[in-house]
Amino acid sequence: NYCENYCIYCGFNCHNKIRRAKLNAEEIDKEMAAIAKTGLQEILILTGESRAKSDVKYIGEACKIARKYFKVIGLEVYPMNSDEYAHLHECGADYVTVFQETYNSDKYETLHLAGHKRIFPYRLNAQERALKGGMRGVGFAALLGLDDFRKDAFATGYHAYLLQRKYPHAEIAFSCPRLRPIINNDRINPMDVHEPQLLQVVCAYRLFMPFASITVSTRECERVRDNLVGIAATKISAGVSTGIGSHVEDIEDKGDDQFEISDGRSVDEVYKALLDHDLQPVMN
């Protein structure tokens, strides 16, 4: 959870006084093994945006470890060049998700006060560079609540649509995150993006791109997630932690969470909930 950016809404930002941690290869292996025991066959690897602490080689080694345990590997890391994405693909990564946060470039500058993330165009083009690097799929998201959510949702959808036309083979995915409170700032909230507005965004993505994957994360509560998978969402996470080293008890140097989660159910509990809704759980 080391980061070089100053994003005022994120718990990992470089000026937020939190416990920082970085897992070594042995600790990563332990975490992966613990997660794999739950039955999950897909893993999402995240870092803070610090090339100094989490360089491409380090992320690549994490992908190689993950390949021992999981069929599908996703990345949410800092934007990279095409050759770097190609290296990570060779190490086992299948898809890349990049949150643009907001597509309003003026608002973007007021939210990202320092670090490489301030470079709006470089982040905007990350998904295309990932596809050029051989990634099978790419994910798109705006952090709903930072700016006008309807404009950001429209821009997210159009961004994905343009790349789908240019790269017809690409697997396209949407995430629909709303702002959540962070350590040292529990007043952060998604402003006017309430549950009906979130449903509107999810349904708009589904109507606009019928074959895209739509993820609803543990930022949302159990009730909302259970309802959305019955309407338009296709992927939900389970047994989640946004902290560092939180899946294994004997990792002593644990890092603080990126944000508060709302649905703390285990993999088994989410699996059962899907069955109770007459849905078929698929683990990868």
Question: Language-model features: where?
Answer:
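Surface-exposed amphipathic alpha-helices with a cationic face
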Residues: A36, G60-K68, H89, L131, ...
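Conserved strand-turn element in the central/C-terminal portion of the radical SAM core barrel
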Residues: I43, S50-K53, E76, M80, ...
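Canonical Radical SAM [4Fe-4S] cluster-binding loop centered on the CxxxCxxC motif
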Residues: N1-E27
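Short Fe-S-cluster ligation motifs
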Residues: K30-S50
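Auxiliary Fe-S-binding modules of radical SAM enzymes
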Residues: R165-N284
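Glycine-rich tight-turn/loop motif centered on a GG-T
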Residues: H15-K22, A52-K57, Y108-F120, D186-D192, ...
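Radical SAM/AdoMet-radical enzyme domain recognition
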Residues: C7, Q41-I43, D55-L143
